[in-house]
């Protein structure tokens, strides 16, 4: 026996059904958008080491334009793009690849690209990563100077990787900003060569001393591009203006003029990196004052870790930091030890 034919839905009824379906779809979209945003915030603020690799935050755009999470690895960028160059550099596990990355491509992915927040870099087997670094003591012996330079080499490596990381993590940032990150990454690689060359002249090689991924333990907590430049350019690289001047004097005192010259050269080039951060923090947040910068640092970082002594005021002023900013930075005291 044949089933009775269903009665056709009248146009008015069809319209009501479609309207109800559309309302339900909008509600689902709104719910997933909010859930995705909450997930992003939690993932960004969590300690990276506590986020399992199965929850690597690859994301996709919702119809509303928000980024929503997908389980599994982030999507791999297309070959021949700047994004793929950055991806390959961060994930590279060969020392030669870290020291000599491929030439930077000219092509970019389309404007709407997924967020790719890589949780950790590839590490060459030569580098022995430890949980706690050994502090550099005296520089009189070549081994002491080589150890210090090895630490600085690894700082530059992490800086290069994190510039590439930010290029992938913040695809919604202006193209010119992301292009600048790639250029700075190339500068950091050049600095690595300066350090590696002098380490070799002292009779040592990359990998003879342990390293710590201190920057990687902290910087990926940055929630947006402004937070990133606050941490790296206005924080870490600004502090290096003091550290490079201090170590240049110490190397010269130890009779190592070449080591002192390298410190001075890198310190001078850091001014441009800090200026880049000043420019973009102002562009992204409309204003750069001490308090807005301090609040942009991801916990537990604070201004105490982003300055050396004595403050290199002239270099910082050349980089675009104001007298008022420097006065507050110099005077700032943490609420508790270790902040």
For each of these PLM feature ranges, what is it?
Residues 13, 19, 36, 65-66:
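Residue-identity detector for glycine
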Residues 64-339:
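Non-heme di-metal
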């Amino acid at each position: 026996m044949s089933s009775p034919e269903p009665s056709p839905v009248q146009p008015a009824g069809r319209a009501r059904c479609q309207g109800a379906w559309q309302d339900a779809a909008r509600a689902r979209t709104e719910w997933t958008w909010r859930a995705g945003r909450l997930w992003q915030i939690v993932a960004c603020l969590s300690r990276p080491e506590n986020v399992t690799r199965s929850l690597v935050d690859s994301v996709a755009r919702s119809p509303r334009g928000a980024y929503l999470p997908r389980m599994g690895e982030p999507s791999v960028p297309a070959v021949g793009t700047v994004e793929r160059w950055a991806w390959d550099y961060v994930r590279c596990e060969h020392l030669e690849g870290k020291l000599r990355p491929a030439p930077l491509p000219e092509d970019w992915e389309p404007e709407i690209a997924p967020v790719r927040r890589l949780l950790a870099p590839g590490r060459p087997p030569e580098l022995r990563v430890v949980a706690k670094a050994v502090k550099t003591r005296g520089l009189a012996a070549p081994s002491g100077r080589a150890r210090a330079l090895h630490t600085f080499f690894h700082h530059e490596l992490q800086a290069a990787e994190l510039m590439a990381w930010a290029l992938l993590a913040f695809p919604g940032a202006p193209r010119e900003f992301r292009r600048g990150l790639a250029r700075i990454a190339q500068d950091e690689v050049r600095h690595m060569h300066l350090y590696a060359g002098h380490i070799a002249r002292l009779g040592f090689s990359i990998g003879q001393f342990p390293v710590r991924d201190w920057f990687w333990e902290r910087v990926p907590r940055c929630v947006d591009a402004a937070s990133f430049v606050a941490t790296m350019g206005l924080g870490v690289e600004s502090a290096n203006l003091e550290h490079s001047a201090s170590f240049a004097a110490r190397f010269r005192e130890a009779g190592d003029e070449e080591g002192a010259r390298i410190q001075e050269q890198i310190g001078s080039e850091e001014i441009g990196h800090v200026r880049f951060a000043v420019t973009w923090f102002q562009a992204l947040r409309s204003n750069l004052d001490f308090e807005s910068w301090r609040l942009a640092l991801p916990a537990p970082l604070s201004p105490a870790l982003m300055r050396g002594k004595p403050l290199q005021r002239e270099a910082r002023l050349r980089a675009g930091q104001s007298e008022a900013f420097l006065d507050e930075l110099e005077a700032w005291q943490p609420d508790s030890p270790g902040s």
